[in-house]
């Protein structure tokens, strides 16, 4: 009994003074391990008679339980202490300046495209798409281009090699090709825009070999030039968010429209007129080429360059800057993901 009490007292003293989990584990082995002090006491059971063995075994088990409980309590205390020390060491100093967060931005062409789509959607226009590689029928013939029209020549259009003698293929020069495919494969009425890349052999401050274009088409019964002028006028004023913009429609010529017009705008009375888009009533030959009766259905079409509208709205001087990938230039505009317009929020950044 005295030896058991002495062992318990010694164990409690050592465990009480221990300062870390490593030393606590060593004391656990010292008292409860295979060759520990308590295990040594258990070995004495073999030399005792049955009654003494029973009494001594009960006392040894109680000793073992008390030491285990003492170790467990101390272990919890030390673990909490170590956790607090770690948290204190890892504490974030909120006064330290944060790391600069690099975030991408929306390209001005994408931003402008989304704004254009948003405006046209208010007039009930949907979006149609088509292939970038086209044949001459969809790109020229169906749109009433004569066989000797200059636009068909190599110096204006990118033709694909190896197709000259069979079915000439080319990079589309306008998204009007989407209109032809949609009218061939569907039935009127139509009201949609076609947005996408177009390609022409030209490069200077106001032209690039590849550019983005939106072309719109409306086909229905009793459509006239008044409808066209209304849509274009409201579209221009909505996009530039200026109800006082002046517009003028100048007579022009396009193979696929008759009559045709160029649209000029000026923001203020003292500004110069700026040409922004072409439009007109769909030519009867175009309707005939896609199987639509021009005596029953009429329509209007218009086309505009996305880059051109972006340059006017965001005051960009050189068209080529859109494609140079200059991060400083892109950062200057810094359109964020939340700047993409929606019908509820409007266009203003």
UniProtKB/Swiss-Prot annotation:
Predominant subcellular localization, coarse grouping: cytoplasm
Cofactor(s) in the UniProt record: Mg(2+)
Substrates-to-products reaction catalysed: tRNA(Phe) + L-phenylalanine + ATP = L-phenylalanyl-tRNA(Phe) + AMP + diphosphate + H(+)
CDD domains: PheRS_alpha_core
GO biological process: phenylalanyl-tRNA aminoacylation
Protein biosynthesis keyword on record: yes
One cellular component (GO) term of this entry: cytoplasm
Molecular-function GO term, any one: phenylalanine-tRNA ligase activity
Keywords, ordered alphabetically: Aminoacyl-tRNA synthetase, ATP-binding, Cytoplasm, Ligase, Magnesium, Metal-binding, Nucleotide-binding, Protein biosynthesis
Record text on cofactor binding: Binds 2 magnesium ions per tetramer.
InterPro entries to which the protein is assigned, alphabetical: aa-tRNA-synth_II (IPR006195), aa-tRNA-synth_II/BPL/LPL (IPR045864), Phe-tRNA-synth_IIc_asu (IPR004529), Phe-tRNA_ligase_II_N (IPR004188), Phe_tRNA_ligase_alpha1_bac (IPR022911), Phenylalanyl-tRNA_Synthase (IPR002319), tRNA-bd_arm (IPR010978)
UniProt cross-references to NCBIfam families, sorted A to Z: pheS
Assembly information from the UniProt record: Tetramer of two alpha and two beta subunits.
Protein name as catalogued: Phenylalanine--tRNA ligase alpha subunit
Source organism of this protein record: Rickettsia canadensis (strain McKiel)
């Amino acid at each position: 009994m005295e030896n058991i009490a002495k062992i318990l007292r010694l164990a409690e003293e050592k465990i009480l003074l221990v300062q870390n989990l490593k030393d606590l584990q060593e004391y656990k082995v010292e008292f409860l391990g295979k060759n520990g002090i308590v295990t040594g006491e258990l070995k004495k059971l073999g030399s005792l008679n049955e009654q003494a063995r029973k009494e001594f075994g009960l006392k040894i088990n109680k000793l073992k339980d008390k030491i285990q409980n003492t170790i467990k309590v101390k272990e919890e205390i030390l673990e909490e202490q170590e956790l607090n020390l770690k948290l204190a060491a890892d504490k974030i100093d909120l006064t330290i300046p944060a790391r600069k967060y690099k975030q991408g931005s929306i390209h001005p062409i994408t931003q402008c495209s989304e704004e254009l789509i948003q405006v046209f959607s208010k007039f009930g226009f949907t979006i149609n798409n088509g292939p970038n590689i086209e044949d001459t029928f969809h790109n020229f013939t169906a749109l009433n281009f004569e066989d000797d029209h200059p636009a068909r020549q190599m110096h204006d259009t990118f033709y694909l090699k190896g197709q000259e003698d069979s079915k000439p293929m080319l990079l589309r020069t306008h998204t009007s090709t989407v209109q032809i495919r949609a009218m061939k494969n569907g039935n009127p009425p139509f009201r949609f825009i076609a947005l996408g890349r177009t390609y022409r052999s030209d490069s200077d401050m106001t032209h690039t070999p590849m550019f983005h274009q939106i072309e719109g088409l409306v086909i229905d019964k009793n459509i006239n030039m008044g409808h066209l002028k209304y849509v274009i006028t409201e579209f221009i004023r909505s996009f530039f968010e200026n109800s006082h913009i002046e517009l003028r429609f100048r007579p022009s010529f396009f193979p696929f429209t008759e009559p045709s017009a160029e649209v000029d705008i000026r923001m203020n009375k003292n500004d110069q007129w700026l040409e922004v888009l072409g439009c007109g009533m769909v030519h009867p030959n175009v309707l005939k080429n896609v199987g639509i009766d021009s005596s029953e259905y009429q329509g209007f079409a218009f086309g505009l360059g996305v880059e051109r509208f972006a340059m006017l709205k965001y005051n960009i001087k050189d068209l080529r800057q859109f494609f140079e990938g200059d991060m400083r230039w892109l950062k200057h505009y810094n359109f964020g993901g939340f700047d993409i317009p929606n019908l509820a929020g409007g266009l203003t950044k």
